[in-house]
Curated annotation (Swiss-Prot):
Keywords: Transferase, tRNA processing. InterPro entries: CmoB (IPR010017), Mo5U34_MeTrfas-like (IPR027555), SAM-dependent_MTases_sf (IPR029063). This is tRNA U34 carboxymethyltransferase. It catalyses: carboxy-S-adenosyl-L-methionine + 5-hydroxyuridine(34) in tRNA = 5-carboxymethoxyuridine(34) in tRNA + S-adenosyl-L-homocysteine + H(+). Carboxy-S-adenosyl-L-methionine binds at residues 91, 105, 110, 130, 196, 200, 315. Homotetramer. It comes from Tolumonas auensis (strain DSM 9187 / NBRC 110442 / TA 4).
Length: 326
């Protein structure tokens, strides 16, 4: 079941305790909102999933809960059918009692690109902004994060996360809140803040950077991954309408422009640590995500261009430090 009370208990005696002045009212308002049309149906599925739980949890090199053969073949089929109610599964993959949830995105590939370049997460408070299904929260926990908090306003992602959490025994140090970054007060409490695949969806990228900064403690680390284009520090692509069929893409900076933005916002030790072209092996249709995917968003005769004629998706990871002077 969806439970926020356990998070309140966790943070009550932590450096996040001041969040309790505003958070319960926000989440009560979310729960009482009528905008989540499928939420009652998904909650009924979550109730049925309470029957399944395993003490086998591997978060070190994958997200694996339960093992093949731990439950009967019939129960495995029932579990798989229940999990299919949360289609489309976009971020993963997950391995649940031998069921391979082959998600649209190979989010493990992104994690493998990011992890070598960031500060160790052991004993850190971590915030993942726009966390989707919560896949990376589990990988962060697997790296020893003391507290991993994800925020994303999508009810479906919350239910996907809750399903995985329930199956693994409800880890008290991993939590998902259905909020956007703009709804958070300036907590200035997290050791590491991740924003991966969010910046280009924001109408004001500079405001987004400042919102991320407001969540970091002095000396904390920002890990930002976004779509980029080639060019100098003054190059920014603003799509006329859609980009790769997405109608909510606003600004795609060059790496040099992104570094300039981060420095302009007061970040220190700013660097690009990875650059990678997104391929149809990393983002594609699967049994668990049967809608259109990257292959349908590129020109059929030229995969280096989107269907609109823009450069095909290329992503970069930037790491920066919040200074202590502001």
């Amino acid at each position: 079941m969806i439970d926020f009370a356990s998070f309140y208990q966790v943070i009550a005696k932590s450096r996040l305790s001041h969040w309790l002045h505003t958070l319960p009212a926000q989440l009560n308002a979310w729960e009482n909102s009528e905008r989540h049309g499928n939420l009652p149906k998904w909650q009924r599925v979550l109730t049925k999933l309470e029957h399944y739980q395993s003490s086998h949890v591997n978060l070190s090199d994958r997200v694996e809960i339960g093992q093949p053969g731990e439950i009967s073949a019939g129960e495995t089929r029932k579990l798989e059918n229940l999990l299919q109610h949360f289609h489309p599964w976009r971020k993963g993959p997950f391995y649940l009692f031998g069921i391979h949830i082959d998600t649209e995105w190979r989010s493990d590939w992104k994690w493998d690109r990011v992890l070598p370049h960031i500060s160790p997460l052991k004993d850190r408070y971590v915030l993942d902004v726009g966390c989707g299904s919560g896949y990376h929260l589990w990988r962060m926990r697997g790296e020893g994060a003391e507290l991993a908090v994800g925020i994303d306003p999508a009810a479906l992602f919350l239910c996907q996360f809750t399903a995985v959490k329930q199956l693994g025994g409800n880890d008290p140090q991993v939590h998902f809140l259905p909020l956007g970054i703009q709804e958070l007060p300036p907590l200035r409490a997290f050791d590491t803040v991740f924003s991966m695949g969010v910046l280009y969806h924001r109408r004001s990228p500079i405001d987004h950077i400042y919102q991320l900064k407001d969540q970091l403690r002095d000396g904390g680390e920002l890990v930002l991954e976004t779509l980029i284009v080639d060019g100098d520090e003054n190059t920014v692509l603003v799509p006329d309408d859609r980009y790769a069929q997405m109608n909510n893409v606003w600004f795609l900076p060059s790496p040099a422009a992104m570094i300039k933005w981060l420095k302009k916002c007061g970040f220190q030790d700013v660097r690009m640590v990875d650059e990678d072209v997104t391929t149809t092996d990393e983002q594609r249709k699967t049994e668990w995500m049967q809608n259109d995917s990257l292959a349908q968003y590129l020109m059929p005769d030229d995969p280096t261009r989107t269907i609109e004629g823009y450069p095909a998706p290329k992503r970069a990871v930037f790491v920066a430090t919040r200074g202590s002077e502001d």
